[in-house]
């Protein structure tokens, strides 16, 4: 019996020794790095903060109930701002706080071609990653110098319509320039916003977030025709945009298509419009576990615009859409091939269009 107990103790000891000890962040780091971490922490927590404030206000007896009821009625019935360009606050886009946010990774933008400010554009952003932080840095702030690189272009990053049903958080999103990704919203921004008014769509959406893993760029694009149809309807040129480093910000639990986990995630997506990848990044005081993204450079390549082709005699609208879709996919592949050896040296596989 004693030998069995000793054997068990030895086994437990070896198991514990095999578990890597967490890597803690040093206490003495430059103040700027602390502020960068704080900026990202607040950004990641903003939905929770807004919901906490809202429910706290609801808990105050009687005094605020009537204004809160009016506010909720206004959100659900009258306010159509998310589908009409939102309510962006210009100074917020240029706030120095976003420099700290972008400097955390750090995030960069590389321009391939000038964009005519008299035209409208649809930026297709790839990959989705877990939270699409690179898209926010690029299109919702001026921290990476977007406004200087593309003068006269006024982009709105689009997100799920359901996000604009969350009290207070919806107002924060619109203040940052975000709008709904609905068809109506896309058309309103591109046709009523004037010259230079543009939209940025994270094309892969929730499905692609399940493919987000370091060293991999599996894109959901083969059957994504919605943004192509919007381009044909509005005449807006397509601009392929690839971010190297987006998928490196978090690590995700592996789940193949036949696993129970993957099926569960897909059911959530069909029911709610978004999915729940099981991921982890780092914490405030450690490098191995938490909800903060890892510090990894993000290089966003903004490609050359692809104009909507003119309709040839006898050509149908569906043929135009498919032709433009093929051109866009080739442009994305070409963009990846030209920069992969610079910004994706540690990749474990090449770009693949999986859906």
Curated annotation (Swiss-Prot):
InterPro entries associated with the record: DAGAT
Keywords: Acyltransferase, Endoplasmic reticulum, Glycerol metabolism, Glycoprotein, Lipid biosynthesis, Lipid metabolism, Membrane, Transferase, Transmembrane, Transmembrane helix
Pfam families: DAGAT
pH dependence, entry free text: Optimum pH is 6.0-8.0.
Molecular functions per Gene Ontology: diacylglycerol O-acyltransferase activity
Family membership noted in the UniProt record: Belongs to the diacylglycerol acyltransferase family.
Protein name: Diacylglycerol O-acyltransferase 2A
Organism: Umbelopsis ramanniana (Oleaginous fungus)
